[in-house]
């Protein structure tokens, strides 16, 4: 049974959303939001985003959203003290991440990562992209320091990292 306790009800919401890749009826991993996924030797994953795909606010979903997550969030010790998601590690090694163009990104490991695509298709999918256009005003590397300090105070946050965390929670964000 997938849902046993009241707190497991969150899985209903999670499975109700599209993800980058998902399982088809034969339980094969196939593109969902992505237009295409190229996998080479189980170690190089190239994602091609659908043209015209947008975030819920209508802003384009682009490679910048992946770059922002990888460089400015996942590897930022203030936002992710434990570092990038464990599913991104192969024998302790992080992937090389590349933006190939506005709609194409690539992750490359020196060894195969058999857990990467299944993690993206899971009930609580691996996070690899965030809406950069929306979150940059809450990130210390992008926001005007005075404006950010005012937002931290106005929202009664401990610091900019807590404020960023509140706004990056897609299940709890109010705007």
PLM features per residue range, with description:
Residues 20-22, 46, 129:
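Hydrophobic/proline-rich hinge and linker segments of small-molecule sensing/allosteric domains
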Residues 23-30, 82-91:
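Short, solvent-exposed secondary-structure boundary motifs
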Residues 36-80, 106-111, 116:
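Aromatic- and charge-enriched surface segment that lines or borders ligand/interaction sites
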């Amino acid at each position: 049974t997938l849902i046993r306790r009241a707190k497991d009800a969150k899985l209903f919401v999670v499975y109700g959303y599209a993800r980058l890749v998902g399982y088809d009826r034969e339980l094969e991993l196939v593109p969902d939001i992505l237009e295409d996924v190229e996998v080479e030797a189980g170690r190089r994953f190239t994602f091609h985003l659908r043209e015209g795909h947008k975030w819920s606010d209508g802003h384009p979903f682009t490679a910048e959203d992946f770059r922002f997550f990888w460089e400015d969030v996942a590897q930022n010790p203030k936002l992710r003290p434990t570092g990038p998601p464990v599913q991104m590690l192969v024998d302790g090694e992080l992937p090389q991440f590349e933006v190939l163009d506005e709609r194409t990104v690539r992750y490359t490991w020196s060894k195969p990562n058999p857990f990467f695509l299944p993690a993206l298709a899971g009930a609580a999918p691996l996070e690899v992209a965030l809406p950069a256009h929306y979150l940059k005003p809450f990130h210390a590397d992008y926001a005007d320091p005075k404006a950010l300090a005012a937002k931290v105070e106005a929202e009664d946050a401990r610091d900019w990292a807590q404020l960023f965390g509140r706004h990056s929670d897609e299940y709890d964000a109010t705007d």
